[in-house]
C-alpha cells in the first residue's frame, strides 16, 4: 500500500494507493492479518493462503512462498500459498461435457439425492495436479464405479474432491508451520454450496466462516486503498467485514 500516482484514464486524477494480487487481496479482505490466519477461495480452482507474518517460510510440503502485503514504511508480511486448478471447473465439466446438470447450482440438490458417495471418488486432474503434488502428468479419474453408481454419486464425488484437495492444502500448511489451524475463512462462488461447506468442515474437523460480502478480493483491495489514504492501522480491516455463516464439524472421528 503506497502512493503509486494517479489514474490517467477512465477517472483521471483518482489516486492509486493499493495494488494487490488476486489471492493476496482475498487474504487481506478476509482480515487474515495475523500470523496463522488462513483462507481458501473456492472458484474455478481453489487457492489457500495462510499468513506467516514477517517470517519467510520455505515449504517442505509442496507449497509456494509469497509476499502477502506491505504497507509503505512497514515490514512486509509473507504467506504460504497452495493452489489447485480444478474446483468449480469440475462442476462446469459435469454441466457442459456430461450434461448431468442444467445449471451449476443444480449439483447440490442432485448430490443430496444420495446419502453418501457410494464409494465413488473423483480425481479432477484435468490439467495435472498442483499443490502439493506438482504432477503435470496426472489425469482425471473416477474410481469405485459399479453398476449401482449413478449421477448423484458422481455429483457428490465431484463436490467432495474439492474438499479433499483443500484438506491437502491445509494439511501441508500445518506441517510447514508446525501448527493446527482452529478455523478456515472461505469465499468464492462455491461457498453458496452448503453441502460442500459442511463436508469441508467435517473432514477438516474445523469451523468454517464465510463473509457477508463474498466479493472478497474487491473488498480487500478497496479497503487497503482506503486505509492507506486515511492513514489507518491495518487492524481496522475488521470494521469492514461481517461474518455471514458458520459451519461446524458434524462427523464422527470414526467416519472421518
Residue map of PLM features:
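Glycine-rich nucleotide phosphate-binding loop and flanking beta-alpha elements
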Residues: 27, 34, 46-48, 86, ...
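Short beta-strand segments
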Residues: 20, 39-45, 49, 68, ...
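Glycine/Thr-rich phosphate-binding loops that ligate phosphate moieties of nucleotide
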Residues: 52-256
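A general structural signal for short secondary-structure junctions and capping/turn motifs
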Residues: 30-32, 38-41, 83-84, 111-114
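Conserved phosphate-binding catalytic cores of ATP/NTP-utilizing and phosphoryl-transfer enzymes
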Residues: 3-37, 50, 54
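Conserved glycosyltransferase catalytic-site signature
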Residues: 20-25, 44-45, 200, 215
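Contiguous, well-ordered alpha-helical segments that form the cores/surfaces of helical PPI scaffolds
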Residues: 25, 47, 220-224
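Anionic group-transfer/hydrolysis microenvironments
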Residues: 1, 31, 45, 83, ...
